[in-house]
Design a protein with these regions (language model features):
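Glycine-rich, positively charged N-terminal anion/phosphate-binding segment
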Residues: 39-58
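Gly/Gly-Pro- and Ser/Thr-rich, intrinsically disordered tail segments characteristic of DNA damage-repair
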Residues: 78, 113-124
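Surface-exposed amphipathic alpha-helical tracts and adjacent flexible/coil segments at the periphery
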Residues: 1-23, 28-31, 35, 54, ...
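Conserved phosphotransfer cores of two-component systems
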Residues: 110
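Alpha-helix capping/helix-boundary segments
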Residues: 101-102
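Short beta-strand elements of ligand-binding domains
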Residues: 66-67, 97, 117-119
């Protein structure tokens, strides 16, 4: 088995997140149009935006994969051919269908696009993976429930031309590869059509039928009981083993998460993957960057066996808040920034950016674009000037630590 450097595939829920993923080192991004995708609550890309997004990515040498992974009903299936032709004409590199009918339509109506079988298909063995290849798939996104040993077994038994993609980072679903009806039953929002309300994150208690109104927690905790709560996956410390398993693509979950998340997690995995592949010991500072985004407690998922559940707390950990984003910066460090959250002259903050090792900075007095002094910019999205200690790339972040809650 040839050892291949995996593609780093990163989330792009909208144009801002796309720019961040591209700038911070993605080899490819995955996104959705306004139809047939599994993230209804992200902005996604309109027919006018999609060609612009593809051009932005392709100009940077980044591929674009588009999800077509809902389970379509009859009326939607009838609308699929025109949509697939639109994606093909726009220059999408690969489509990610979950439904067999959609997969076959993609081969007919989007002949220039590769077909990557979605994780919603729960591909969990070599026979299934090979069958999809025989039908025309160039890649399968394996079920998240597989161990490293099982993935290696698939790699050894399928055609070497078939690419294998696995998730390496992000939220995990308590159901099998996302096949869940809790949201449908409890809220009327279809989890298999991009509308999951995440009822697995709700607080639950037990009630005995002869004692109505008396609620008994499954686990004693003043915050509630989280009987279906899953940790987030983080495999950044195990990328060498993922490479050894013959995985062709490492996927970061999170199209519905923030642009900051897309940037920081992409950058962290880019640096560590490059170091691992080159035989270098990864710099710890990049591994620690995944702790600087909002997340639940981390685990290695199913890669090393059954992960169990995290039953203490369902809340996200948020240790860092974004103050501003750098729009441009000259060689002397004179920068134009866009405000995200309040901060003031004299604050100690961190600066992190594309290919930029994080560093601390004490904020000097600032000014607006007309040169009027600012001690504390206050208006969200306002543009202002500040003197940084050195030149930093556009799309760098100014951030500061915040007090933890929920740990």
């Amino acid at each position: 088995m040839d050892r291949r450097k995996p593609e780093l595939l990163c989330p792009a829920g909208d144009m801002e997140k796309l720019r961040m993923a591209v700038a911070y080192g993605a080899d490819a991004v995955y996104l959705a149009g306004t139809s047939f995708g599994m993230r209804s609550f992200t902005a996604n890309f309109t027919p006018d935006e999609l060609p612009q997004a593809i051009k932005l990515a392709h100009d940077a040498g980044v591929k674009v994969h588009c999800t077509v992974n809902i389970m379509p009903r009859n009326d939607e299936a009838a609308a699929l051919p025109a949509y697939l032709e639109q994606l093909d004409a726009a220059g999408v590199d690969a489509l990610i269908p979950a439904d067999l009918g959609a997969f076959m339509m993609a081969g007919k109506y989007a002949p220039h696009c590769q077909r990557h079988v979605s994780t919603q298909q729960s591909v969990a063995n070599y026979a299934c993976a090979q069958s999809w290849f025989d039908l025309g798939a160039s890649r399968v996104v394996l079920a998240r429930e597989l161990s490293l040993r099982e993935i290696l077994g698939i790699r050894e038994r399928v055609s070497p031309e078939l690419e294998l993609e696995t998730f390496c980072h992000g939220a995990m679903c308590v159901s099998y590869s996302g096949r869940c009806l809790l949201s449908n039953y409890m809220t009327g929002r279809d989890s298999n059509r991009g509308q999951c309300a995440q009822p697995c994150r709700y607080q639950y208690a037990l009630m005995e039928e002869k004692r109505p109104g008396e609620y008994f927690p499954v686990f004693e905790d003043e915050k509630g009981t989280y009987i279906m709560n899953s940790r987030d996956m983080c495999m950044i410390d195990h990328l060498d083993e993922l490479c050894d398993a013959g995985i062709d693509c490492l996927k970061i979950e999170g199209r519905a998460k923030s642009a900051y998340y897309a940037a920081i997690v992409t950058g962290a995995y880019r640096h560590v993957l490059d170091d691992v592949w080159a035989g270098r010991t990864p710099d710890r500072i990049w591994r620690d960057e995944v702790e600087h985004v909002s997340h639940r407690h981390y685990s290695t998922g199913f890669y090393y066996g059954q992960p169990g559940q995290f039953t203490e707390n369902s809340r996200y950990l948020r240790e860092w808040q974004i103050c501003a984003v750098v729009e441009k910066c000259d060689a002397e460090g004179n920068a134009v920034l866009s405000l995200r959250n309040k901060f003031a002259a004299g604050d100690t903050v961190e600066v992190v950016g594309p290919d930029l090792r994080p560093f601390s900075w004490q904020v000097p007095p600032m000014e607006d674009l007309d040169g009027v002094p600012l001690l504390e910019p206050r208006t969200p999205q306002m543009r202002f000037r500040a003197k940084l200690p050195k030149r930093v790339p556009p799309l760098s972040f100014i951030r500061h630590a915040v007090e933890l809650s929920g740990r």
